[in-house]
A protein has these predicted regions:
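Metallocofactor- and cofactor-centric catalytic cores in central/energy metabolism, strongly enriched
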Residues: 1-203
Length: 203
């Protein structure tokens, strides 16, 4: 979850509580095939970088979901995004479904700036040409949860492919630059390790 310290410690505590509630709600919805694990609120460039590095190094992590509860200055996301190797989903939502017009004050407005923060995050991702899935909608809505679930299944397939071994029998070994060039590209782009076995191995 993205935030910042500008609005004080109470705001950060509220962001943390709301984020936990959202993650628990998503996991308890029964709509998601993979468990979402909350990794805390990132309030600085170093904290963002630490979260993304941890995601890269965690074999159980198949993707990262980001959400900006309040305004999170996007320059602090640059170094983390440059290092992220896992699939990324940007969840453009807000904690409250309805705006409390009768009771809304500046504290509420400072705390709940998803529209501002998510737009800022979307800008830096586009500026950096970061490949990502963007899901827009209220986090409790089934349609939103369905879109997250579809992305999760794609991530699961991607994660499985990272250590996949493919055997090609009777491979074409003439003009190796072409055939092995495709194998190199398959491993570089998709994680598929392709080996050759002669057709006699099938006998």
């Amino acid at each position: 979850t993205g935030a910042q310290l500008l609005y004080g410690g109470d705001a950060v505590i509220a962001v943390d509580a709301h984020s936990n509630e959202m993650v628990n709600g998503l996991n308890e919805s029964g709509k998601l095939p993979v468990k979402v694990v909350y990794k805390g609120t990132a309030n600085s460039s170093k904290e963002v970088e630490a979260v993304f590095k941890a995601a890269n190094n965690d074999e159980k992590c198949i993707g990262v979901i980001t959400w900006m509860h309040t305004f999170s200055p996007a320059k602090m996301w640059i170094h983390g995004l440059q290092q992220l190797k896992k699939p990324l989903l940007h969840l453009h939502t807000q904690f409250n479904k309805e705006i409390p017009w009768d009771t809304m004050d500046m504290d509420f407005m400072n705390l709940n700036q998803s529209a501002h923060g998510d737009r800022e995050f979307g800008h830096i991702c586009t500026r950096m040409r970061i490949r990502r899935k963007v899901v827009v909608g209220y986090w409790k809505d089934e349609d939103t949860q369905h879109k997250i679930a579809v992305w999760m299944r794609v991530c699961a397939g991607w994660a499985d492919s990272q250590d996949m071994l493919i055997i090609r029998f009777g491979d074409q070994m003439n003009n190796v630059a072409v055939t092995d060039g495709d194998k190199v590209e398959a491993e570089q782009r998709m994680g598929y390790h392709v080996d050759y076995c002669p057709a006699s191995e099938l006998m």
